[in-house]
């Protein structure tokens, strides 16, 4: 084979390789294009499905939002309808009150007309008597001049003395009759005012107790509340000062304590712990603190609601909060806040009947026992504390005097002060309103805590077990272990000297030191 032939064969082979490579590359390119087209179509299909899913999800969310908005709108409409109904009821009540006032005014006008007619008759009777006296004087004078040798002046003097004696006797009789009639009318008027006020003021009182019950979902929860070796129940009792009674009562825990605020705090905290399910000392401290804040908010709301219901406005915000604390105070078993509202209504009604300032009378009646809201740490009677509070928050002098005089400590200087004292007596003396035994029991428990907290270094104390035990928390940096034993003996001796109680009282002094560090 010649070189030329070899070159030609090589060229042909190269050309053949190029043609074959061209067709191979074309086939591969077409396959890639077909694959890319299929992938693009798949991506487009997936995008369409995703878009459809997003569209459906957006529609569902829009429907849910529309449903929520519809529910909110319906709720708002119901609330506005209820508010309008309440306003309508208040307007109807005001109309009824105005009608009663008009009737009272008409009755007073009729009474005044009757009295005026009676006075006119008396005046006419007196004038007739004066005419008769003048006639008698003339007759006596003529007779004396005829049969007597007396001078005119002497006869005149004798006649005047005789007439004076007769008139003095008649005037004394008339004065006595007038006084008796005035007393009878005053008694009838007072009884009428009191009966009318009592009939127009109807208030219910529920006897306060010293226990609360917390319902449990099951009896297994009792073991979780007690905790390992009783640490949970001890923590809750220490933080709240309330005694937890866990007995055979199914699905229930009893909270016992004489301080309603502490008992309510413990009840709310225990409810939260049961609902949450996590019960351990750290969680208990957190829930007790939250419960204290909730109780404070509730106290403020009760004060605002009370002022609104009674119709007393313009009270200082601090005084409103103090007023709300009366919700958790009792006097001989009678709730002090309900008692204060009843006194306010009675005083206002009686003031209206007598033409006095009803709003000022309500204000004085509502605040007359405000001193009972202050804890026993502040010295002084509730009257003295109430006067200090009213003076501090610049209340009206009539209100201050009503507080000071409603138990007879001072003389009342206004009719409103007398009405407040009368309303207080009416509310307290109503059968079933008060209970002596419960009040004495609560006073004994308060005295226990007062004695315990009077010593230096004591942080707080709690009377528990129905007054059979008092637990004293002391400051660890102020009292050591030996001083804690001596403090327990001193408190025990003072309790024996100052209190009368059945059985024995256990005095427990607790000194606790904590070291807390945070790992970062």
UniProtKB/Swiss-Prot annotation:
InterPro entries assigned to the protein according to its UniProt record, in alphabetical order: HD/PDEase_dom (IPR003607), HD_domain (IPR006674), HDIG_dom (IPR006675), KH_dom (IPR004087), KH_dom_type_1 (IPR004088), KH_dom_type_1_sf (IPR036612), Ribonuclease_Y (IPR017705), RNase_Y_N (IPR022711)
Phenotype caused by lack of the gene: Essential; depletion mutants show a significant increase in global mRNA half-life a decrease in at least 1 specific mRNA processing event; in a more severe depletion experiment alteration of about 26% of transcripts was seen. Later shown not to be essential in 4 strains, with a doubled doubling time, cells are translucent, suggesting a possible cell surface defect. 168 trpC2 cells able to grow on minimal medium. Loss of competence for plasmid transformation, 1000-fold less sporulation. Increased sensitivity to a wide range of antibiotics.
Residues in coiled coil: 29-141
Top-level taxon of the source organism: Bacteria
Protein name, UniProt field: Ribonuclease Y
Organism lineage string: Bacteria, Bacillati, Bacillota, Bacilli, Bacillales
EC number assigned by the record: 3.1.-.-
Stated regulation of activity: Shows preference for transcripts carrying a monophosphate group at the 5' end.
GO BP term (any one): mRNA catabolic process
Domain notes: Has 5 domains: N-terminal transmembrane, coiled-coil, KH, HD and an unnamed conserved C-terminal domain (residues 430-520). Both the N-terminal transmembrane helix and C-terminal domain are required for protein function in vivo.
Entry's cofactor comment: Magnesium. Can also use manganese or zinc.
Primary role: Endoribonuclease that initiates mRNA decay. Initiates the decay of all SAM-dependent riboswitches, such as yitJ riboswitch. Involved in processing of the gapA operon mRNA, it cleaves between cggR and gapA. Is also the decay-initiating endonuclease for rpsO mRNA. Involved in degradation of type I toxin-antitoxin system bsrG/SR4 RNAs and a minor role in degradation of type I toxin-antitoxin system bsrE/SR5 degradation.
Recorded family membership: Belongs to the RNase Y family.
Domain KH: 210-273
Recorded GO MF terms: identical protein binding; RNA binding; RNA endonuclease activity
Cofactor(s) in the UniProt record: Mg(2+); Mn(2+); Zn(2+)
TM helices/strands, residue ranges: 4-24
Sequence ranges on the Cytoplasmic membrane side: 25-520
Stretches assigned to the Extracellular side: 1-3
Record key words, sorted: Cell membrane, Coiled coil, Endonuclease, Hydrolase, Membrane, mRNA processing, Nuclease, RNA-binding, Transmembrane, Transmembrane helix
Subunit structure: Homodimer. Component of a possible RNA degradosome complex composed of rny, rnjA, rnjB, pnp, pfkA and eno (although rnjA and rnjB's presence is unclear). Interacts with RNA helicase CshA which may also be a member of the RNA degradosome complex. Interacts with full-length dynamin-like protein DynA.
Membrane-topology annotation of the record: Single-pass membrane protein
């Amino acid at each position: 084979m010649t070189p030329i032939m070899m070159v030609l064969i090589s060229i042909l082979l190269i050309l053949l390789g190029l043609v074959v490579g061209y067709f191979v590359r074309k086939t591969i390119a077409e396959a890639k294009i077909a694959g890319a087209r299929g992938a693009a179509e798949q991506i487009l299909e997936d995008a369409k499905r995703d878009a459809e899913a997003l569209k459906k999800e957006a529609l569902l969310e829009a429907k849910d939002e529309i449903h929520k908005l519809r529910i909110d709108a319906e709720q708002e409409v119901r609330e506005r309808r209820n508010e309008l109904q309440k306003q309508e009821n208040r307007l109807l009540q005001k109309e009824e009150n105005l009608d009663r006032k008009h009737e009272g005014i008409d009755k007073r006008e009729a009474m005044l007309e009757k009295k005026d007619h009676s006075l006119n008759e008396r005046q006419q009777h007196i004038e007739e008597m004066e005419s008769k006296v003048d006639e008698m004087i003339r007759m006596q004078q003529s007779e004396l001049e005829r049969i007597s040798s007396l001078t005119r002046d002497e006869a005149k003097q004798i006649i005047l003395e005789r007439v004076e004696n007769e008139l003095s006797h008649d005037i004394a009789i008339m004065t006595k009759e007038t006084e008796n009639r005035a007393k009878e009318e005053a008694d009838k008027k007072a009884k009428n005012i009191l009966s009318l006020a009592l009939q127009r003021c109807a208030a219910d009182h529920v006897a306060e107790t010293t226990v609360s019950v917390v319902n449990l979902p099951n009896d297994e929860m009792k073991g979780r509340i007690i905790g390992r070796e009783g640490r949970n129940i001890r923590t809750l009792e220490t933080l709240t000062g309330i005694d937890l009674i866990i007995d055979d009562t199914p699905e229930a825990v009893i909270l016992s304590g004489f301080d309603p605020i502490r008992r309510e705090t413990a009840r709310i905290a225990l409810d939260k712990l049961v609902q949450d399910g996590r019960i351990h000392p750290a969680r208990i401290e957190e829930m007790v603190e939250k419960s204290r804040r909730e109780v404070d908010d509730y106290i403020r709301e009760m004060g605002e609601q009370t002022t609104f219901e009674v119709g007393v406005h313009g009270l200082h915000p601090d005084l409103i909060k103090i007023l709300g604390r009366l919700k958790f105070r009792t006097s001989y078993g009678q709730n002090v806040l309900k008692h204060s509202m009843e006194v306010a209504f009675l005083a206002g009604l009686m003031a209206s009947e007598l033409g006095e300032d009803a709003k000022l009378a309500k204000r004085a009646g509502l605040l007359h026992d405000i001193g009972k809201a202050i804890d026993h740490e502040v010295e002084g009677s509730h009257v003295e504390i109430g006067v200090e509070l009213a003076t501090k928050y610049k209340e009206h002098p009539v209100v201050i005097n009503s507080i000071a005089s409603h138990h007879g400590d001072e003389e009342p200087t206004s009719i409103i002060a007398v009405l407040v004292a009368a309303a207080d007596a009416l509310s307290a003396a109503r059968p079933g309103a008060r209970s002596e035994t419960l009040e004495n029991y609560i006073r004994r428990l308060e005295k226990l805590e007062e004695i315990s907290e009077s010593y230096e270094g004591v942080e707080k104390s709690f009377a528990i077990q129905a007054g059979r035990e008092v637990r004293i928390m002391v400051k660890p940096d102020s009292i050591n272990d030996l001083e804690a034993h001596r403090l327990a003996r001193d408190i025990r001796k003072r309790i024996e000297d100052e209190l009368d109680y059945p059985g024995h009282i256990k005095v427990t002094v607790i000194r606790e030191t904590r070291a807390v560090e945070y790992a970062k």
